[in-house]
Amino acid sequence: MKKNNLSDVKKANRQLVYECIWSHKSVTMTDLAYVTHLSRPTITSLVQEMTADNLVIKSGYGTSNGGRNPVLYHANVNAAYAMGIDLEFPKVRMAISNLECENICFSVRIYPKDADKDQVLQLMKQ
């Protein structure tokens, strides 16, 4: 059985909090602490790290029955991108999408039938 060190626990907690933010779309730190069963200081630290890493964004303020309005957080869907390339004669299709699978960029290029690999790569760079 593998022992968990502090680094492993922190990574697991960070992943748990990020998945909670992702699935709830807009959530407060109090909600995160309730759902994840982590302490408020742990949640605060992890959310600050993820905000600094641009994974999480402040999305506004929630409502309160008294006191300060809580800050709402949501996942930054543009924190990372995926790229897909489809090479099929006689064309190259390329797409870039964000974390919500929204197309950011889509391109189709036609290459000549006698093109070699270097010409196809050059066409893709354009």
Q: Where in this protein do the model-derived segments appear?
A:
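A short, glycine- and basic residue-enriched loop/turn
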Residues: H24, G62-N65
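N-terminal phosphate-binding loop and adjacent alpha-helix
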Residues: F106-Q126
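Short gly/ser/thr-rich secondary-structure transition/capping motifs
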Residues: N65-G67, Q126
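Gly/Thr-rich phosphate-binding beta-strand-loop-beta motif of the actin/hexokinase/Hsp70
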Residues: N69-F106
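N-terminal helix-turn-helix
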Residues: S26-K58, R68
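Extreme N-terminal segment that seeds HTH/winged-HTH DNA-binding domains in transcriptional regulators
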Residues: M1-V35
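Non-catalytic beta/alpha edge segments that cap or flank active sites
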Residues: W22, V47, F106
